[in-house]
Amino acid sequence: MADRARAARMAKRIQTIVANTIEHSVKDRRLELVTITDTQLTGDLHDATVFYTVRGRTLDEEPDREQAAEALHRARGQLRKAVGDQLGVRFTPTLTFTLDTVPETSARLEELLAQARQRDQEVARQAEGATPAGDANPYKTSPHEGRPESEADGW
């Protein structure tokens, strides 16, 4: 079991190596719009999970995630070799590529928060000129409340 700090440093280094290799060495056009977002390394330093996102060519175009996954799978050997050459460790970790769903989840949460804000504004508009039903102070009070303690006890 390796030190957690060492595993974190190695994971960050693997992320950098994989991203640079995809950008400069891998000759697959399907990987042009792939971004490496994170890497996690197991405690024994033998397996690395590389998280990635895929953008569309335009803002309106849906990204081709299946083609990117296939291209990463095909380039896995070249990427692992680059990691082994540049990392300088005895055992080069195996690379597993996983689509990062954080951007989609984040966008969905932003959408839900915007809907909640809109509903809150509607409630605030409806409550703007309203008066409370009943008394201004709806809580029951005892007849002794508000008087000094010596008078309240009857002494």
Swiss-Prot record:
**Subcellular locations according to the entry:** Cytoplasm
Spans of biased composition, class Basic and acidic residues? 116-125, 142-155
The reply on keyword Ribosomal protein is no
InterPro entries reported in the protein's UniProt record: KH_dom-like_a/b, RbfA, RbfA_dom_sf, Ribosome-bd_factorA_CS
Where in the sequence is the signal peptide annotated?
A: none
Main localisation: cytoplasm
GO BP: any one term = maturation of SSU-rRNA
Q: Name one GO cellular component term.
A: cytosol
The answer, when asked if Cytoplasm is one of the entry's keywords, is: yes
Question: Origin, by domain of life?
Answer: Bacteria
Q: Where is this region: Disordered?
A: 116-155
Molecular function, one GO term:
ribosomal small subunit binding
Alphabetically list the UniProt keywords: Cytoplasm, Ribosome biogenesis
What is the protein's quaternary organization?
Monomer. Binds 30S ribosomal subunits, but not 50S ribosomal subunits or 70S ribosomes.
Q: Which PANTHER family match?
A: RIBOSOME-BINDING FACTOR A, CHLOROPLASTIC-RELATED (PTHR33515:SF1)
What does this chain do?
One of several proteins that assist in the late maturation steps of the functional core of the 30S ribosomal subunit. Associates with free 30S ribosomal subunits (but not with 30S subunits that are part of 70S ribosomes or polysomes). Required for efficient processing of 16S rRNA. May interact with the 5'-terminal helix region of 16S rRNA.
Q: Which HAMAP family match?
A: RbfA
Family, per entry: Belongs to the RbfA family.
The entry's protein name is Ribosome-binding factor A
